[in-house]
């Protein structure tokens, strides 16, 4: 088994046949070595027990039930007094049944088989190392043609081929004729090589260091040559140089990881533990089996057939043997990666078999679904909605999600306050949703942050911590300013919520991951908590005001015409004099009493420095009063002067929206200044 404390990473690579044998074989107490799967059977149809030496054999993979052998005998696991440690009749050890989750077996292949990942996947590692075309290697692997072994001292087939050329145009077609001759098997095995065995021989003869040296020399020679002037030839040179670089890198990787190239050709085929390819009984007594079991059975059937052809009959035609070797190669290819050679293999219901590659790759594969992104406890998921009244570091959790996430903490609180005698009573109170439950839940949530995450997590700000509060409904409320870090919007996006359990995780969430501590982008340093989308539209509406300017009166015929056009569409609108207010509180109060609108223009008394008023600006209008005072009306402000031209007061032309926006900014600045003064 993999120790989680010693092993912190997982890597897929090549292993030697000796390592596969060490993983799969075991010695039972009577000295017998078991581990090889020789029969393509699973369960006996009468006894419903695993077949001996089959794909679910209890001698190889361990007992189905802990401490119970195939005969039905029982022994206490771990008891030193119990003797023997295995059943002498069936050979099953008395161990825990969990061994069937990691105990492997193996199939001893009669002929070598190339691993399809290293042959057909692009780039082809076997083709790169041998520096041969992929089509040529495929023809050799699948027994479409053969090649002669180099033998110098003895007569070879190459020396005899001249006598057949007058009858057969191509001498390679004469090889199958020799294969059908009785007693020619010795000569054939000595001189003719085909299938994956031929690939294995060539890979075993490779010297990786010489490959690196020769490739480097050729790469330098190609680099010294200048452009040929022919575009096609120049492209061929560039492709050849790229190939040489890949070949050198591949050879260096094999040397660095102590991997032999011939390991890409399999002699022993590992068999997965039975719990990873189960057979399940469903309603009605029917059995459901993993597709991998059927693919393993196909491999064993064809391998046993090849063994019988080679051992039982010496007069077997060579073409039949080559055809059976090809079937074994195709069966192993289908087991490892169904459909990689073209049309995938299907069952009787025209359903594609799910191979080993299909099990581990993709979003629903073993790695991404179970190992990397598996679902965890103390987590939930829901749609996010905007929470404008929330603080930047807070989020709103629905009651339904919060009570599930913090259920254990609420149970502990109920028991500590002697409101429940045990866990069962506490759970019943939670199901009944008593008021005391929500009070304890709020106390728990005040001291416990939560983590919000939106997939995909492309950078550090994709997961941040927040202080949760209870909200009604079934959606998570989020402050709109933190959306840019998550790359989220409120059109149906979902976010996951997690509860940090350990003290270290809670400390990290509070000190490093709170949203108000991540205001700048970690990549470029720009502010990331800035208004976007709906907030910008809201600010525009809040500060837009009315389209009628100060000159919209009878003295300006253009604006008067526009005003008359507006009255056509807004028949309920009645022009009124713009009101005057002494302070912002009176203006906001009038808006709340619905005396004015949000974008209605008004005059607000303002403490404005005279120096900011342009001296050359000419007033648009001047209104005189009976006592001699007069009003100078400008584009955006109004000055009240006395007869002696002394300034009494200044009014600015604004709206309630502008006033509200200004007050929010002023309060935020004052709060920030107070916080800074407290820190100093």
Curated annotation (Swiss-Prot):
Q: Name one GO biological process term.
A: DNA-templated transcription
Keywords assigned by UniProt, alphabetized: Chloroplast, DNA-directed RNA polymerase, Magnesium, Metal-binding, Nucleotidyltransferase, Plastid, Transcription, Transferase, Zinc
Q: Where does Mg(2+) bind?
A: 489, 491, 493
Molecular function terms, GO-annotated: DNA binding; DNA-directed RNA polymerase activity; magnesium ion binding; zinc ion binding
Q: Where in the cell is it found?
A: Plastid, Chloroplast
User: Which reaction(s) are listed as its catalytic activity?
Assistant: RNA(n) + a ribonucleoside 5'-triphosphate = RNA(n+1) + diphosphate
Q: Which Pfam families match?
A: RNA_pol_Rpb1_1 (PF04997), RNA_pol_Rpb1_2 (PF00623)
Name the cofactor(s) required for activity, per the record. Mg(2+); Zn(2+)
Q: Which residues bind Zn(2+)?
A: 69, 71, 87, 90
User: What does this protein's record comment on cofactor binding?
Assistant: Binds 1 Mg(2+) ion per subunit. Binds 1 Zn(2+) ion per subunit.
The record's section on InterPro entries has:
DNA-dir_RpoC_beta_prime, RNA_pol_asu, RNA_pol_N, RNA_pol_Rpb1_1, RNA_pol_Rpb1_3_sf, RNA_pol_Rpb1_clamp_domain, RNApol_RpoC1
Listed under subunit, the entry gives: In plastids the minimal PEP RNA polymerase catalytic core is composed of four subunits: alpha, beta, beta', and beta''. When a (nuclear-encoded) sigma factor is associated with the core the holoenzyme is formed, which can initiate transcription.
Q: Which family does it belong to?
A: Belongs to the RNA polymerase beta' chain family. RpoC1 subfamily.
Tell me, what does this protein do in biology?
DNA-dependent RNA polymerase catalyzes the transcription of DNA into RNA using the four ribonucleoside triphosphates as substrates.
What HAMAP family does this protein map onto?
Answer: RNApol_bact_RpoC1
Q: What name does this protein carry?
A: DNA-directed RNA polymerase subunit beta'
Native organism is Capsella bursa-pastoris
Q: Which gene encodes it?
A: rpoC1
């Amino acid at each position: 088994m993999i120790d989680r404390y010693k092993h912190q990473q997982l890597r897929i690579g090549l292993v030697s046949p000796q390592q596969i044998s060490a993983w799969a074989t075991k010695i039972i107490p009577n000295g017998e070595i078991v581990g090889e799967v020789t029969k393509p059977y699973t369960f006996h149809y009468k006894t419903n027990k695993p077949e001996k030496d089959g794909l679910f054999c209890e001698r190889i993979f361990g007992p189905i039930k802990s401490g119970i052998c195939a005969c039905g005998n029982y022994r206490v696991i771990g008891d030193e007094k119990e003797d023997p440690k295995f059943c002498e009749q069936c050979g099953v050890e008395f161990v825990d049944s969990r061994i069937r989750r990691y105990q492997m077996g193996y199939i001893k292949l009669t002929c070598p088989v190339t691993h399809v990942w290293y042959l057909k996947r692009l780039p082809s590692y076997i083709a790169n190392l041998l520096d041969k075309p992929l089509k040529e290697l495929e023809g050799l692997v699948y027994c479409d043609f053969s090649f002669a072994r180099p033998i110098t001292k003895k007569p070879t087939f190459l020396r005899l081929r001249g006598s057949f050329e007058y009858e057969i145009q191509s001498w390679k077609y004469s090889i199958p004729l020799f294969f059908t001759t009785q007693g020619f098997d010795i000569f054939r095995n000595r001189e003719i090589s085909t299938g994956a065995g031929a690939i294995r021989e060539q890979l075993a003869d490779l010297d990786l260091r010489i490959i690196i040296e020769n490739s480097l020399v050729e790469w330098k020679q190609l680099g010294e040559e200048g452009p040929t002037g022919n575009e096609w030839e120049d492209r061929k040179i560039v492709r050849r140089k790229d190939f040489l670089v890949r070949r050198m890198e591949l050879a260096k990787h094999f040397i660095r990881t102590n991997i032999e190239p011939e390991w890409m050709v399999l002699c022993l085929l590992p068999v997965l533990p039975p719990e990873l390819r189960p057979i399940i009984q469903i309603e009605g007594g029917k059995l459901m089996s993993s597709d991998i079991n059927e693919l393993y059975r196909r491999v064993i059937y064809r391998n046993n057939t090849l063994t019988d052809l080679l051992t039982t009959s010496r007069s077997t035609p060579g073409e039949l043997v080559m055809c059976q070797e090809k079937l074994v190669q195709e069966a192993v290819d289908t087991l490892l990666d169904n459909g990689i050679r073209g049309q995938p293999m299907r069952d009787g219901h025209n359903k594609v078999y799910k191979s080993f590659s299909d099990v581990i790759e993709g979003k629903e594969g073993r790695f991404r679904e179970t190992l990397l992104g598996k679902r965890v406890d103390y987590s939930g998921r829901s749609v996010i909605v905007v929470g404008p009244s929330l603080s930047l570091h807070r989020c709103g959790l629905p009651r339904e999600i919060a009570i599930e996430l913090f259920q254990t903490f609420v149970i502990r609180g109920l028991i500590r306050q002697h409101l429940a005698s045990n866990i069962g009573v506490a759970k019943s109170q939670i199901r009944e949703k008593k008021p005391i439950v929500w009070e304890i839940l709020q106390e728990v949530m005040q001291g416990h942050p939560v983590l919000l995450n939106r997939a995909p997590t492309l950078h550090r700000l994709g997961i941040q911590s927040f202080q949760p509060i209870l909200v009604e409904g079934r959606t998570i409320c989020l402050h709109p300013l933190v959306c840019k870090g998550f790359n989220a919007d409120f059109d149906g996006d979902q976010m996951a919520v997690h509860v940090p359990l350990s003290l270290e995780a809670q400390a990290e969430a509070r000190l490093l991951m709170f949203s108000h501590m991540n205001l700048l982008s970690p990549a470029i340093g720009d502010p990331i908590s800035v208004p976007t989308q709906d907030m910008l539209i809201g600010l525009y509406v809040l500060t837009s005001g009315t389209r009628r300017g100060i000159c919209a009166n009878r003295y300006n015929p253009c604006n008067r015409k526009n005003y008359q056009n507006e009255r056509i569409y807004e028949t309920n609108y009645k022009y009124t004099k713009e009101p005057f207010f002494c302070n912002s509180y009176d203006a906001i109060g009038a808006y709340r009493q619905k005396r004015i609108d949000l974008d209605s223009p008004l005059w607000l008394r303002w403490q404005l420095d005279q120096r900011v008023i342009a001296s050359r600006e000419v007033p648009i209008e001047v209104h005189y009063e009976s006592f001699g005072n007069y009003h100078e009306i400008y584009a955006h402000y109004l000055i009240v002067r006395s007869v002696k031209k002394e300034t009494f007061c200044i009014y600015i032309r604004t709206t309630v929206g502008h006033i509200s926006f200004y007050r929010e900014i002023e309060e935020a600045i004052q709060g920030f200044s107070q916080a800074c003064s407290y820190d100093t």
